[in-house]
Swiss-Prot record:
The keyword RNA-binding is assigned to this record: no
Lineage of producing organism: Bacteria, Pseudomonadati, Pseudomonadota, Betaproteobacteria, Burkholderiales
Keyword Protein biosynthesis assigned: yes
HAMAP family: Arg_tRNA_synth (MF_00123)
Quaternary context: Monomer.
GO molecular function, one term: arginine-tRNA ligase activity
Gene Ontology CC terms, in alphabetical order: cytoplasm
Species the sequence originates in: Cupriavidus metallidurans (strain ATCC 43123 / DSM 2839 / NBRC 102507 / CH34)
Protein name: Arginine--tRNA ligase
Amino acid sequence: MLPVQTSQLAAAFTDAVRALAPADANLPAVTFERPKAAAHGDLACNIAMQVAKSLKTNPRELAQKVVDAVKADSRATALVAALEIAGPGFINLRLSPEARAEVLRAVLADGDRYGARPVGEHGQVLVEFVSANPTGPLHVGHGRQAALGDALANLLAWQGWSVHREFYYNDAGVQIHTLAISVQARARGLKPGDAGWPESAYNGDYIADIAADFLAGKTVSASDGEPVTASGNIEDLESIRKFAVTYLRNEQDIDLQAFGVKFDRYYLESSLYSDGRVEAAVQSLIAKGKTYESEGALWLRTTDDGDDKDRVMKKGDGTYTYFVPDVAYHTTKWERGFSKVINVQGSDHHGTIARVRAGLQGLDIGIPQGYPDYVLHKMVTVMKNGEEVKISKRAGSYVTVRDLIEWSNGGEETIRGCLEAGVADWPAHFTRGRDAVRFFLLSRKADTEFVFDVDLALKQNDENPVYYVQYAHARICSIFEAWGGADWEARLGELASVDLAAVTAADVSPQAIALGRRLAEFPDMLAAASSELAPHAVAFYLRDLAGDFHAFYNADRVLVDDETVKRARLALLAATRQVLKNGLAVIGVSAPQRMDREAAPA
């Protein structure tokens, strides 16, 4: 149902139960869910079973009284055609044809905003994701973060939040020094395995590319920074460091552009030190008695806030442990007015959650417990040609986001080749690969491991889940083209006020009813996915919606001779196309109007 319909029906049920309960009774909220079997109706409610014990009555008897009261309520009679009691006290509901028609009209009227809440309904939210070290190409784990984080940010925006996307660069750790000496070694003509090659050095081919550009005195720039020109002096480690970091930030920017992800801000860890924020946070914790010294180190009393043991903040050599700048960084989020913050990170960061939260609580500046929220994801395994791919030649030790996009795109075209050729709209050349990677990485819950099958991503048939969904959209477009010609989109307005009885009446095909029911669930699905920080739910929904469409398409011919029936079915397809388009937009995947199709395997 539409949210307004749900509220109206819930109010009728609530009033019915309240009239049967003592005035001071604490009643649960009335909720509805889809029955497991379509034969049981459109919705089910278990309120009678929830409150029967407290009211000292039989659940079925209570359910009957609720049903009698709801049937007499005009708010419900406009929406419900039938109410039935099942099992120990479930109340099954069948919606009226008018209620079904109201859903289709709402989709057609709201268009690209169907399922969205009013802009500004909520406050500000900051979503931090990817946040890779600028020491190498983005790997598939970063790709999963990018897909999750961007889809989650879109979801929150659809729910009326003002969303700020942020990328935190860890550009102040020991890994940056390792990057610099790796490039320096390459610039000196060394390669992995040679005598004198640093043991901790990065081995990917990208290090040789950086070294070559550094020796050539080239200039590079990241999206938010000043250009950096290489000095070419292989003894100047600081110059190498600056050039290498900027070079890799630019490479990561290219990968994110190919992936269709944009950030509002890139926040540098190094700025927390140069601005004195790290030291200020530490001194504040000391002043508030949240630290102590032991074994030559400074410790934070994280056990005061639920951690299993206290943690070292400052080591004996005077350097800070890695969670300390994180505390300072999250303080800036709070000070910038973000009362809601969500971090999307790999599950290997689980151990830092309690430490960061304990540090924030220790500062005693009003930050609520449980701040920030976290979405943790597990690893991704890549399969290609039936075998696991563990190493990328470019990265040296892992598969990159760029690898996945190019492999899943089909053909021989590469991102580097497009850039070197000066192709202006090069990201559009990789739409197929981007769509596949984004959809695949959202097709499982974040907290489950995922196997990315490149061979499956390349298939152009129903075995490929992203193709299956996109083809539903393209097939609908082809039906409209057959109906309205090349300018069919301009004619969709004709369907806004058609008689919808042929797709909403009680005696129409179950496939038509199921498809309309799925369209009605879209707003509530988005709200739940946003609340639960679960963007995978959108991908799940889209696969179900595509399945319902294909079932309807196979059951009911659309372009029939009967004009009334034809227009009603076209209106149902127009609404389906709109919801497919909206859902794909939420997860950052395109909705093509034409698609090639290969034969399914025998």
